[in-house]
Amino acid sequence: MKKSLKLAAAATILATPAIADTIPVPYNTLNTNMENPLYMPGARVFYSKLSNGLMLKVADDSEAHKDKHHDGSTEFPIIRIQEEMGYGITDRLAAHFSVQYTHDDDIQRTGLSAGRLGLTYRLLNLYNGFVWDIYGDLHLGGIGEMRGQYNIAGDAATAQATLTQLTPAIMAGQMTKEQAAQMALGASLLDAHGVIDYDNYSNGMWGFHVGTKVGKVWDKLTTSAFVEVLRTFGDDNSRIRIAGSNAPILPGYSTALVLASMGAPSEVAAEFKSVTEVNAGLNAFYQWTSKWSTGAWFRYEHHADQGIEKITTDVAPELEMVKKALEDKLSDMNDGFDAYIIGLSAAHQFTDHAQVAVYGEYTFDNAHERSQNGTDAKVEAGVRVNFKF
């Protein structure tokens, strides 16, 4: 009897590794390779992913680019640096933070271009390799102001047409040429047009992202898909300089001169409308060896048209009609765009705690007429350095 018990105990001990071997290897590696799209840090593990990229863009022929005489222009190098870090609170719950900085010297635009802080929860992590995550992030666009310069020009055709209409009154002595000119100039400002030169990449608004990700692991192959929604909260966290054109509206009168004579402010704040945006994507990842891995992805981004709810800066009474006309004109800025991004990466695991990846992306886009984000070509390449401890 004692011999039988000993044999049973020995059999149990020998069988234990076999039971462990029935757990698929990928189930145990989702917290190992930081380039895996389903990566999540284990409990009490901190990770950092620092991406350093260079981008080249060729501007399309949108109305906004034409107004800036920038259509067809090449922007290079555009410096893009992104830091993503996270911490495993438990094996299923992780906190994460990311921030991106972009510098484009060709258009004198620089600053934080993305930022988010949030939590990811792993709802499912099955032994067959199926994974389901949900996450929610605070959108950090409200950290800084939206800054730029609105280059405004009165409509010369409107001024000339108004002056022509008033010519009989001038001939009849009902008004002077100077009075008629002032009316014509005022009418030209009501039909004014312009374009914003952005100083930075912030939209000046807080918001939140909510999203979900599902994936499956087959031995060395991982695939995943995600979809997320961003909702921003409109506010007037903006500072926009007003620059009148020096081109003549009427002989001897320019937009800059007319605005100065009317006491126009040098800068204004505007309350931008809340918007809803959508991102979605697919990822594939292959673990060739314990050291080498590659990834590929497709991502879709829908960026909504921006719009101004109202200009919150007080202006002189004679400028109220101009202010209202600008609010109406900019209520729908028609500057949205859709981006379709494909990317590839290759990574090498140097140690259990350090990894380096190279990556490249190409973007196709479909931009609205007043968008400054439309391109004929957009490509980015860079190096990402990953650590965990």
Residue ranges of predicted features:
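Transmembrane beta-strands of outer-membrane beta-barrel pores
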Residues: 52-60, 99-105, 123, 138-144, ...
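Residue-level signature of outer-membrane beta-barrel architecture
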Residues: 87, 91, 121-123, 138, ...
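Repeated loop/turn-to-beta-strand initiation elements of outer-membrane beta-barrel proteins
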Residues: 91-97, 126-132, 220-224, 290-294, ...
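Outer-membrane pore/translocation modules
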Residues: 101, 108-272
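Outer membrane beta-barrel transmembrane domains
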Residues: 59-70, 236, 242-389
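Surface-exposed strand-loop-strand hairpins of Gram-negative outer-membrane beta-barrel proteins
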Residues: 51-81, 149, 193-203, 369-371
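Outer-membrane beta-barrel biogenesis signature
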Residues: 19-59, 127, 170, 354
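Hydrophobic, lipid-facing positions within transmembrane beta-strands of outer-membrane proteins
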Residues: 30-32, 46, 79-83, 113-117, ...
